[in-house]
Amino acid sequence: MLIEQLWTANAYRNFNYLIACPETGEALAIDPLDHRQCLATAKRNGWRITQIFNTHEHGDHTGGNEAIIAQTKGKLLAHHKARDKIRGIDEGLAAGDTVKVGNGVALKVLDTPGHTMSHLCLFAPSNPPALFCGDTLFNAGAGNCHNGGDPNALYATFTQQLALLPCNTRIYPGHEYIENNLGFTLDREPDNEQAMALLAEVKSQDPNHAFVSTLALEKEINTFFRLDNPTLITKLRETFPDLPRVPDPKTVFLKLRELRNKW
């Protein structure tokens, strides 16, 4: 499996992705907002975009669909419940489905509600594994639930799906928010040495060659995976004094999401 992470350099700080089969040169475009860059990259690599995959329905992820399809005649894949939100879906996908790219790439579909209720991620059981997670999971962060989402569903997605993936899974999110998200981690957990070290590293990074984290690292630097951390809970109680002495993980997650909305 060949992966191209494409930095759009737009105000929303989007990443687009191309996944290609090395045998056939067929490629899948994920959330190809910057259709010109996606098409140019595919051409430069000698790839043919045969499928387009939308993680969810928001315009900064679907905005390049029509231009890509017009150029490639590629088939559009998205959540089976998003047909009224994304125009021109050719194949509606559900949890457990497989997206095949060429002969050698098979991606497992994960139904990951939270950011929206029709959000999908793609998991590649490659070596190492990879997760293309749209706006569900960010480096050191979690998607918001402002526009059609539900934080309760997002909690379930994190704890019942994402946290159970292999620890060496490489994380490919839909946006580049790592510096700001690490700032939130350190606001909540000021003694997190790994977050401090990584923040110093990524402050000077070129998003065209962005840092790629793993699930193991996310569990060390991402507050939304660190729901039983004593420092984090003590800090949370400063804002929410009625928090139980030993709060349940869901309560911690929801309070963190509430704080992050305003941070």
Swiss-Prot record:
Gene: gloB
UniProt superkingdom: Bacteria
Alphabetized SUPFAM superfamilies for the sequence: Metallo-hydrolase/oxidoreductase
Subunit structure: Monomer.
Main function: Thiolesterase that catalyzes the hydrolysis of S-D-lactoyl-glutathione to form glutathione and D-lactic acid.
Similarity remark: Belongs to the metallo-beta-lactamase superfamily. Glyoxalase II family.
Listed cofactors: Zn(2+)
EC number: 3.1.2.6
Organism: Nitrosococcus oceani (strain ATCC 19707 / BCRC 17464 / JCM 30415 / NCIMB 11848 / C-107)
This protein's name: Hydroxyacylglutathione hydrolase
Catalytic activity, reaction form: an S-(2-hydroxyacyl)glutathione + H2O = a 2-hydroxy carboxylate + glutathione + H(+)
Pathway noted in the entry: Secondary metabolite metabolism; methylglyoxal degradation; (R)-lactate from methylglyoxal: step 2/2
A GO BP annotation: methylglyoxal catabolic process to D-lactate via S-lactoyl-glutathione
InterPro entries: Clx_II_MBL (IPR035680), Glyoxalase_II_hydrolase (IPR050110), HAGH_C (IPR032282), Hydroxyacylglutathione_Hdrlase (IPR017782), Metallo-B-lactamas (IPR001279), RibonucZ/Hydroxyglut_hydro (IPR036866)
Ligand binding (Zn(2+) 1): 56, 58, 115, 135
Annotated positions binding Zn(2+) 2: 60-61, 135, 175
Positions of transmembrane segments: none
Iron-sulfur found in the keyword field: no
Keyword annotations of the record: Hydrolase, Metal-binding, Zinc
GO function terms (MF aspect): hydroxyacylglutathione hydrolase activity; metal ion binding
Cofactor remark from the record: Binds 2 Zn(2+) ions per subunit.
